[in-house]
Amino acid sequence: MNFDPTYNPYSLVGKTILITGASSGIGRATAIECSKLGAKCIITGRNEERLNETLSQMVGGGHQEVVADISTQEGVDILVEQIPNIDGLVSNAGIGISKPIKFYKQEDLETIFQTNTFSPMLIIKGMLKKKKVNEKGAIVFVSSVAAFNAKLGNGMYGASKAALMAYMRYCAREVAEKGIRANSIHPSMVDTPFIHDNTFSEEELQKDITNYPLKRYGKPEEIAQAIIYLLSDASAWVTGTSLIIDGGVSLK
């Protein structure tokens, strides 16, 4: 038997993938990498200019851009109405707030849970009600290693991502009868604009890197490749799973 150079179990040819939070970081990298593997991508975010930048780096044709604020029910409804049926959903949009417990505000809790937890739940609800996720489709929730590892000052963020992980498991049970899979990925620190937003000083970041056995943070495209595995037919028997991608930091 000869070697087949065209064989690729991670191919996304013929698949339509929705990626939220695609205007930067992991979302942008995922859209670009999915397009390289043949997917038609629907990218969404609040900033049209940054979405256009993502689109300019993608390859192939047939991609769609939807500007929507999915932290609101109105934004979720706009997104669900404007898109066609999909074969994959990457629920990536998220925010971070870092505060000690005694400084929590109700507004902070509502904001972070609305974006990180409630919005993904409402998008899935809307897509399923409209029957817009195709049979054998795949859902990937971008959670965080913070769902497992308790870092000082990170309680709100970690709780919102842990809730998303728990929801993923219930979602996986419910959609399995339709042949749809649901999984979550849990990155640790990834070198994106998200970590350079003044939440941490550069000195704190450099010190934190020493905790990683691989001595660096992850790259957005490395997270994207793990997402692609869970979107592709290579993971056809994988559902309800939480995949940790953290450069070994959880080993300590």
Where in the sequence are the language-model features?
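Substrate-binding pocket helix/loop in short-chain dehydrogenase/reductase
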Residues: 100-101, 105-113, 208
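Residue(s) in the substrate-gating loop at a strand-loop-helix junction
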Residues: 144
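Conserved glycine-rich cofactor-binding loop
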Residues: 23-24
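Active-site helix of classical SDR
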Residues: 124, 160, 168
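Short C-terminal tail/terminal secondary-structure segment
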Residues: 2-8, 149, 228, 239-252
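Alpha-helical segment proximal to the catalytic Tyr-Lys
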Residues: 129, 173-177, 236
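Short, small/polar-rich loop/turn modules that mediate ligand/substrate recognition or access, typified
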Residues: 90, 176, 181, 238-240
